[in-house]
Amino acid sequence: MDEIDEMFSNLLGEMDLLTQSLEIETLPPPTRSASTTEINFSVGFKDLNESLNALEDNDLDALMAELVADITDAEQNVATYNNKSTAPFPPADASNSYHFHPPPMPSIITEDLSLLPPPPEFDPHYPPPPPDPLTEPKTQEELESKAKANKINLALSKMKEAKVKKRIVKVHMIDSSTKTLMVEEHQTVRDVLDNLFEKTHCDCSIEWCLFEVTPELQIERFFEDHENIVEILANWTRDSVNTIHFLEKNEKYAVFKKPQNFYMATKGSADLKDMNEKNKVSLLEQSFCGASVTVPELEAALYLKEDGKKSWKKRYFLLRASGIYYVPKGKTKTSRDLACFVQFDNVNVYYGTQYRMKYKAPTDHCFVLKHPQIQKESQYIKYLCCEDPWLLHQWVTGIRIAKYGKILYDNYKTAVQRGGLASHWSTLGSSSVSTAAGSSQGNGQICQNVTTISSSFSDAWKHGEANKQEKKSSEVNKPETKSATPTVTKRPPPTPRRASSISRVTDHPAFPPKPKAINTDIMSGPPQFPPPEPLQPADDFLPPPPPDFFDAPPDFLPPSPPSFMSNAENPPPPPVTQLQMSNAPAPPPPPPPPAPAANVPPLPVKKHPPKPPKRQSIVGPMPGTNAHGGAGGQPDFMSDLMKALQKKREPPT
């Protein structure tokens, strides 16, 4: 029996080897591999159990004869099947089948393939894909069931919302007013602070906090930003008189502003106040962002209140990450001798107020450790007293760091980020509101002096307008000077011409100092004449050349040239000036040298801008005055005066 089994296993192994070689040569599709092995295994046998039973009765020779007969039949069937199925198969497969068909051994395995149905990949007709459930039209029952499911989901969501715990919180402001808020159970203290920032329009500083006050125990503390305010309020009793205040406390995040005061104060560092921002950040990262949070090393002698008594005992306490430890009497400060005073898992730290009066404490700088659910005096409350306020601040901050760890640092970074965004948006939103500094509003906060965009824009606009006005004024003054110079330059030419004409008429280059008195008389004589147009440019003090100003007095003299004397009865002053002006360009003789030499020295003395234009303005009316004087019946007086002046000017013989 063992020999038969061994021969049968050898036969099956040979058939497997033939199957593998056929797969390598013909490269059939991968989907046929499993089925071919199964058929190869069952070739010549309808039932494996029956064949095994038959092996016991039949001898090996008969079995081999049957196997050879089956192999020949299979070879014939494969040959006929390949002849029939060459057309639908690809030419490559057909050529391979023709090429590998003649050998007898591969035909044994191809018989197995002939028993399989055609592979699905060669079937040109595939079944249609299943319809899309989204695009498939739904029946009325399906629509009704879907609507019912939606209603059930909506009802469940509303039930969940109804189960959310909500509390009405009354927050006390600085000016004794209150704000009422609706707080849900998922809201943290940070969310409530952001809500209060929007309502009160404060400066969104990180020092703002919610401050819990428990009057019955005379304790108080500020809530941490990550705490759930609904859970905190759930610990209060129904008849509790505890209050929540919206205050600004610098102690909340002082450790992150000056970490050297808490982590390096006990090391005797001398440059605590001179630490730069980079070193501060590195110290904070090292203390809070490592594998474990570094708790400040605090060791001090504190006063402990005895249970049920108003007496205090001095003990030496040490702060560790797991809690507060103290040194028992007669023991050292080694770790094995330390006794655990309290752990921070289920306690909060509070500030004590007026404990010197209530419990006869050595100082008023006390802090309390108690469970949050304890709202009345109990033996489980721990009272500790410090000698100075700075030591109290160090211990309370160290306990907070040991209890909350890195969460405290995350709260600080979140407060800084939100505070910056809130202040930015509040500044943009308050551009339309401007109130006086220090005035109290109805929201319970003191108005802050916030520089709005509108005010800064108006200031910038005013500054720009002022600069524009200065530029315009400078530009306007420049063209005026340019326009004034030609008007003044136009005025000097007549004066030298008149002086030259007078000199030619009188044959004298200069006059004695008497013309000054004559000038005053003439100026006071005709007040009815309007001033000429070039008065305004004369106010700018752009005088003509010096000789022109001091040659003008001879024009004001009453005596006129001989042509004037001959035409005294018909005085046409404008034509005379026109003739002078018209004749002036043709003969432009320079003034005689003595006249400018004599007139140059008084320049600094007679630098009065109004007088030169007035003298020039009277040049035109002067002949008119003479004409009017002659018409008044006084021509003889004028002629006598002219003769007297000529006699005085004649050199003595």
Swiss-Prot record:
Key words, A-Z: Cell membrane, Cytoplasm, Cytoskeleton, Membrane
Biased composition (Basic residues): 605-614
Family of this protein: Belongs to the MRL family.
Bias (Basic and acidic residues): 462-481
Name of the protein described by the UniProt record: Amyloid beta A4 precursor protein-binding family B member 1-interacting protein
Disulfide bridges in this chain: none
Gene from which the chain derives: apbb1ip
Biological processes per GO annotation: signal transduction
Record keyword Magnesium present: no
Domain PH positions: 295-404
Lineage of source species: Eukaryota, Metazoa, Chordata, Craniata, Vertebrata
Bias (Pro residues) ranges: 116-134, 585-604
Membrane topology value: Peripheral membrane protein
